[in-house]
Structures are given as C-alpha cells and as structure tokens.
Amino acid sequence: MKRRDFIKTSALLAAAAGAGELMKAETMPAAKPEAASDPMQSDEPNEPFEDRLILSAPMLQNFAATSIGVAFAVSALANGYVLVGEKPDLSDARKFLCGGYRVTDIDDRVIRVRITGLKPATRYYYRIGADRIRYDGGYRMKILGNEEDSRTYHFTTAGAEADAHFCVINDTHARWEPFGLVLDKIAELAPACVIWNGDACNVEETVEDQIRIFLNPDIRRKDYASEMPYLFCPGNHDDRGMANRHLERVWMFRQPEERLPRDWDLGRNFAVRQGDMALIGLDTAEDKLDTNPIFAGLFTSGPYREAQTEWLRDALAREEIRTAPYLVAFCHIPLFDDNPRHNPGDIAPADKDPQYSTDFAYWQRTCARMWAPLLEEAGCQLIITAHQHRYRYDAPTADRPWAQIVGGGPDLGFTGSGDNRKEDPGKFPTVVEGLVHRGHLEIRVHNLVSGTIQDRFTFRPRR
C-alpha cells in the first residue's frame, strides 16, 4: 500500500470538530477560530511530528442493518473519529467520535468508533481521522494536531434489500502465506460481508500482537477490511493470552444499546439479515472444560454458552430473521462429528479419556444440545464450523436436518514439519462462499491449494 497523505489541521479546528455530544451523529459545521485566550489552545497548535499518527487502514467490524464499527491503529495518545455520509464527497458528513457516552475513548494504540443510526442496505462513504493528544492530568490536556486519512472509503449496511452473498474464512492462525491466499480469493469473489469463523489468533499476550493480526498484518492487502465488513465468531485460541482476554480492545463489541440489557456481555454474537439470508453467529468458546486444571478456574465458558442460548432463542424470533428464506449459522467448534474417537468436549473434569484421540474438544456436544434444537425448530439449513483444520461436509439426515461444513485449516497441502513433513492433499485452506442464485442458496467451497471449487451444495428455502 502506498504511503498516505495526511491532512494537518490546527488544534483549534480539531477541538471544535470534537465538541459535539459524544457518539451522537452531527452535521459538520464550518470551523471557526476560537479566542487565543482559550486555555485548551496550544502555543504551537501545529507542532511538527515525524511519526505518523494513523498507522493502519480502517477495519470494518460487526456490521448490522443500522450500525457498523470502524477500528484503526495509532502511534500515540489520540482521540479518533469517523466522518460518514451518503455522498462520495462527504459534503453531508456526520462525525462519530470514539468511545461511549460522557467521555471519548483516548487511546495510544487502537481507535474504535461505533457508528449507529444508519439506514439498512445503504451505501455510505467514510474517512477516518485522529487528534493527537497531550495529557498531563485531569485539568491539563490539549490537542496538538490532527491527521485525516486522505482516502475516502465506503461500506454498505446489512438488510433485507442487501446483496445475499457472504464468504467464510477460519483458522488463519496468523500464518501470513495462507492468510494472503484467503484474502486474494475474498477480493476476487467480492462478497457483501465476511465471517471470520475463529482462531485468527494463537496465544496473544499484548495488544501489539492483536494489532499485527487484525489491523496491520504482514500481507499485501493492508486494507483488506476497509470496504468489506467483517463479522467474527471467536475460536478457542482467540481467548488465550492476557491480551485476548479482552479482545474487544481491538475487535470492538457492539454498543450496549444495540442489544438487550440481559445480553450486554454478548457483544460479538450476531443475527443479521443479508438479503434473503439470515446469518447467526455463535461462540463455542474454549475447547477445554472450565474445570480443566490447565486453566486454573479462570475461564467461564459454561455460563457463557448458556447465556447465548437465551439470546439465540430471541434472535431467531425476530421478524427480519424469522422471515428470511435461508438460515445459516456459524460457530468455530463443530456441533456434530460421527467419529467415535473425536472428543465431544464434555469429559469432566480434565477432558481426558483413553477412548478419545485428544484431550481437548474436537466437537462441542454441549453446544449442540443447547443450540441445535432451537436452530432445527427455526428451519436452519446449514451450520458452518471450523477448528479441525480439515475440510468436511456432513449431509443432513433424518435425525439431524441441518447440514454442516467444517472449513479447512492453514496447512498448504502438507502435515507435520521438518523430517516429519509429508504431503496431505486433504490439508488446504478454504473460503466457503454462500449466495442466493436462481431461487436457491448455493454454497461453494473454494480449495486454495488447488485453486478449484472443491464442492458445491444447494439448499431450498426453509419451510
């Protein structure tokens, strides 16, 4: 990506632009200089800085019919914002500030802006900016300067009139070669949204590690999510490490007002209408029990899954979800596996039993028992999962009326390493594409090693 040109403005203009009520959209007024006696004014409002303030392209996160998130990395203490409008020149732009109510979210690494009050299935244009902050105490703070990315981006909100086209990626594990292949395929297919179905991470201990994965990865397409909205179903590795315990510092939650008070902690679950499809996102959480001593009692996956069950019940009853002809659910760990050697994730207390090949969950029987009956009652046709690093399709049966796709992993046709490395044609990354075509939901599974479509499946509208 070429180095961006940044627009420098004075501290006075930045302060005036940020003076509106926090997180409330406002029409941008003409800037007016303030009196020189303003105690917030810097003696040198345009102090030169050698380092760029904005360090990454924006990433579109957790989109919905009337809201979307924008995140980007910064190099110093900053107060960020997004200008949003329906006109390409942003002459109708409204300004959204980072943070929640009362105070802005000043941060020295990641700016997160939640944009609400949007119209469904509507294209918007946007530009990101940030004010460089000097903070010396509760009564001593000032804006030193401002940067705006010179590029204008765009996005389209979800909704019943939106394009019914999605792609799913999974188990990228910060491995840049397969991740680059995945993003090249996404760019080629140009879906309306992408579901990142878990294990983007490994074990991330610092926010800088998370920035490297989501906002500034070591790939060619640095702006991969600047105009393509992403939804996220976390995997078990996305909970591991000190930083990942609060992944929302980089991948934001929805605002509390976007969900019921009961569901405030469920900031990443989604129920989105996208054209004729309803997309449901669930979090299977860890692949080990809360009682496993390796986690020292510091995980609470059990209650988390139960809370999602109540959320799912209500989400499936929502009018825009209930009336969609196609219902597709997403979660990281599979909800079905007929291999008797595969651990179902409910072997107390420490996940170990000699009849199983692993001491972690290969699939999630507990989640299946809680969620599958609700999805079946709603007529769900397909659940797309991940975790096992090997593509598989489980056709529906009389006892299990939904199909399951297990996405591939990051291995490029080989298993093992060093002297133990050997060819394995069943190991390849996938992009699972879904679109409504000729009155059916068509699913295409793209094999990124062979460059071919591995499988195609079609689903009729639900009853």
Q: What are the language-model segments listed below?
A:
Residues K2-V168, A187-L189, L327, E433-R463:
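Acidic, histidine-bearing metal-coordination/catalytic regions of metal-dependent phosphoesterases
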Residues S10, G159, N170, P234, ...:
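Residues at the C-termini of beta-strands that transition into short coil/loop
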Residues F72, Y124, D171, V194, ...:
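Divalent metal-coordination and catalytic microenvironments
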Residues Y125-H154, E208-R322, A348-Y362, M370-E376, ...:
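Extended active-site neighborhood of metal-dependent phosphoesterases/phosphodiesterases
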Residues D163-C233, D238-D239:
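Conserved, compact domain cores that house catalytic/ligand-binding motifs in diverse enzymes
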Residues I169-H173, G198-A200, N236-H237, T284-A285, ...:
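Active-site metal-binding loops of divalent metal-dependent hydrolases
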Residues A192, P325-L327, Q381:
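Conserved acidic residues
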Residues E319-P340:
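Short acidic, glycine-rich surface-loop motifs adjacent to enzyme active sites
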